Amino acid sequence: GHSLGAIAGANLLAVANQKIGNAQADALFKFTTGGLAMPGGGIAPLLLNSPTFGPTIQMSVLTGSSAALKTAFTAYAPNCKTAVPTCFVNEFLPSLDATTQASVAGTLQSYSFAAQSVLDSADPINLGRGIAADFPLFATEVVGDGALSLSDRVIPNSIATAPLGGTEPLFKVLALQPLSATGAANHHATRFVAGGHSSLLAPDENFDPTGAVTTEMQT
């Protein structure tokens, strides 16, 4: 699976291969290998901190919960230098006083907690351990090079304020090892320094214009 498919796929691999005591039934949905491209765990903080989806979600939550904040941003909006949701998070919120910023942080924390409470039972961060250690599993993520090539812009690799959110925490739960690791590990991961979130499917015009990353991922 890729992206959301990889999030659901991790859960599927964990559940479908559990034995129920009937050989015929066990064989019906049995998987023999698994591949996860750009997955993530801790779904609520993952979405809130996604460079792509996060600004829209944060703006919706905050303006929906505070009429005063909505009014203030409406007045501020003509000054925006970027897209409206990005402006709201990166330009408008930092311009607020410390008390208001603390209230904003509290609202987002409460929302994240409530959303994660609903999603927790279907979050791969909790189900991933169900994938057997001897099951052949392979996963990929885009980490960037720290300079010109950015990390995944949809699913964050890790989140400073949410240690269980993102791709890397899920990789730890899945006990994924680098391809270069020695030993008999069956769970492996590759971390690409170029490419984008959808490079498995098509070249990223910004970070993989030649298509080299897509070719490597697909082969």
Give each language-model segment a name.
Residues L12-K19, A37, V173:
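Structured segments of extracytoplasmic/periplasmic soluble domains
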Residues G1-G9:
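Gly/Ala-rich beta-loop-alpha elbow adjacent to hydrolase catalytic centers
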Residues A14-T32:
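Conserved hydrolase catalytic core segment
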Residues D26-T219:
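C-terminal subdomain of alpha/beta-hydrolase-fold enzymes, centered on the catalytic histidine
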